[in-house]
């Protein structure tokens, strides 16, 4: 999996780990850190915040490494380059120590103030707490409509029931995290992976805020790529669909051919229709190319998996213990 550096620390276990993957978010990180620490300081639990830098080109990493907190440990993980959000989340999960683990985006669209409610559900015995967006402020109608259509398509194709309008903002128990960390796959669609282990799940509705500042790092091309990853990572039905299309077209062609032969022999009519034949040939050619493309997507993923490269590489790790916890440890020592 990833290249994990061994970092000596004096706090081997905590109740809650909050993972924040980010990429070029220097504008919003100070506000996020302030709101996170305010929420966590009000909790009676031991906490850690794990910031995962996905190869930022601005000063985000240096900014995070300067963060401190009185009530929770601050850990910073810097990846060697931009491996993508799925890899950054995986790095955070592998480095987490909490009995409960929460993933949250850095852009403050997911309110940190909901963390106590998520923990309350976890204490009721739920292993996964999904946060379902009832409203998506700051998003165009096209993005909302396309997201809804994608989730319907995905749940039609895959066996796992991936909740609609649930992003990466969720809570996972230690048991679920440990199972996810054992998965060897490199092409990761985390929304599906979070659901795949199963276990007892709860869903909390919330209103997703608009982005605090800056611009989203996800354009439509990246979203389409993520959608393709989601479908090909959890379903082989597109391959079966190509086979089904082939059978249907071959059957239709055979039936139409038999009809032409029967019509010519019985009525002596001359077969005409050059334009219609061209349309049929072009349609068949398009379907064949589409099927080859679908097959190529799966073969490409097999090729990537077969190389066995690490999902990510860690360039730097730093840690600042919580001031109050550190003082308590010193007194016990």
Language model feature labels by segment:
Residues 2-11, 189-333:
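Hydrophobic helical membrane-anchoring modules
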Residues 18, 36, 92, 107, ...:
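Residue-level signature of catalytic and energy-coupling elements of molecular machines
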Residues 21, 79-81, 170, 243, ...:
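Short conserved micro-motifs on helix faces and helix-strand junctions that flank
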Residues 21, 39, 52, 121, ...:
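Histidine kinase transmitter module recognition
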